[in-house]
Amino acid sequence: LGHDFHSEVDYHRSKDKKMENLKSPTWRNLLNLLKEAGVEPSQCFFTNFFMGLRAGAATTGVFPGRKDARFVAACSAFFLTQLRLMKPRGILVLGSEVPSLIAPLSPQLSPWIGARLGDIDRQQAAPRSAVLFTPDVPACTVVSLIHPSLRHANLRHRTKALGQDAHAHEVELVQRACEELNDN
């Protein structure tokens, strides 16, 4: 679960090529993490919390729609609709913005309310098991990860908060989440 999809410029570029640029930092780093953790991308459903595109070419930073409470509520509702349809057994939450957006949707994610990734790590709350969003969606495992677009630049921050190698920690988080899924 990412933050948002694209800018208008990059969306049209992908549309013209009839595919995403899988060599972009986000895709390249995410696919490498999944591979290292033993997860097949074909077993994944990729989506974002915020729907829509950023105007222009910028793709980093807080999504402009985050300031609009009605838009955030609509995106929350759409996210829950996706959960009802897809019934995921696990959700990998990418980046520092998304945990606080989905935290209000489940009591099991309460440690994530208002928290940044370092706060989540200090609470040892990055992996959350048996997360229930709505009664009609099976409980699932939810894991908070560094956003892959700036993964290598930000690993050092997570290493500092954890007191251990962040890359190895994230691979282990994904592997453990998959083991939990296979046990259920």
Regions found by a protein language model. Give the residues of each.
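C-terminal capping/extension of enzyme domains
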Residues: 63-76, 103-184
